[in-house]
From Swiss-Prot:
Biological source species: Anaplasma marginale (strain Florida)
Segments forming a coiled coil: none
Function: Involved in DNA repair and RecF pathway recombination.
Keyword Transferase among UniProt keywords: no
Protein name, per record: DNA repair protein RecO
Alphabetic keyword roster: DNA damage, DNA recombination, DNA repair
Pfam families: RecO_C (PF02565), RecO_N (PF11967)
Classification via InterPro entries: ARFGAP/RecO, DNA_rep/recomb_RecO_N, RecO, RecO_C
One annotated Gene Ontology cellular component of this protein: bacterial nucleoid
GO biological process: DNA recombination; double-strand break repair
HAMAP family: RecO (MF_00201)
Family: Belongs to the RecO family.
Length: 238
């Protein structure tokens, strides 16, 4: 049993004295794991784009990878702490929440858009927010930010219900505002597929707090590090 595909490194951890357990995201095969030998070459890092060949006797076996790095993530992320923390966050989210062997080509393509913007030193906040929104929607927990859940109005949408993940208008939500989450304009635009200019650092931080709430609630309750790392990230953004 053998296949070959491009993939993005989602994580590595030691496995015995001579191997690493490697997790990669591929476009056509989804999240895949396998063993790869430790070498004297530069170690694989999260975000690396690799040409991966997987081999095993049976498709249900863990299998082994042989890998060639096509594009290193080092220079795109490791000089910018916020960018690096976002890379660490999304790879942790996807390697933890995505089921193995289930293709999510839209997620893969969105990650590549984020990576391209990061490498080009272009505005990348919106690309990252789209990634986290896609994780929620692809796994069945999409936020509905297109209209008010009560009145169906598309105007003055200022709140999100923490229970349903649906938008509420100012008129409907004002009396309950202390129990609701704010709705940043950029999240609504991205969720509805509307092109918009890159958000500010403050709006990015607020959006990360909101998405972090839903990601933890639905997908990452067993993660002991996600909430703390999200607090650090939003704190760096001011």
């Amino acid at each position: 049993m053998q296949w070959r595909e491009m993939g993005v490194v989602m994580g590595t951890r030691p496995y015995g004295d001579e191997h690493l357990l490697l997790s990669i995201l591929t476009r056509n095969r989804g999240l895949r794991r396998g063993l790869t030998r430790l070498t004297k070459k530069r170690p694989l890092q999260i975000g690396d784009l690799i040409d991966a060949t997987w081999r095993a006797k049976l498709p249900t076996n863990l299998g082994h990878f042989t890998c060639e790095v096509i594009a290193s993530a080092f220079y795109s992320y490791f000089r910018d702490r916020i960018k690096l923390m976002c890379l660490s966050s999304i790879t942790h989210i996807m390697s933890t929440a995505l089921p193995e062997n289930e293709p999510h080509p839209t997620l893969y393509d969105s990650f590549q858009d984020f990576a391209a913007a990061a490498e080009a030193e272009a505005p990348w906040y919106n690309h990252y927010l789209k990634l986290e929104l896609l994780v929620l929607s692809q796994l069945g927990f999409a936020l509905d930010l297109s209209k008010c859940a009560v009145s169906n109005s598309k105007d003055n949408l200022l709140f999100i219900s923490p229970k349903t993940g649906r938008a509420l208008s100012e008129a409907v939500g004002h009396a309950y505002r202390n129990k609701l989450l704010p709705l940043p304009k950029v999240l609504r635009s991205i969720s509805c597929g509307v092109e918009t200019e890159c958000c500010s650092a403050d709006e990015f931080a607020l959006s990360l707090k909101i998405l972090g709430f839903f990601l933890h609630r639905h997908l990452l309750q067993e993660s002991h590090t996600f909430q703390e790392s999200r607090k650090i990230l939003t704190g760096l953004l001011g």
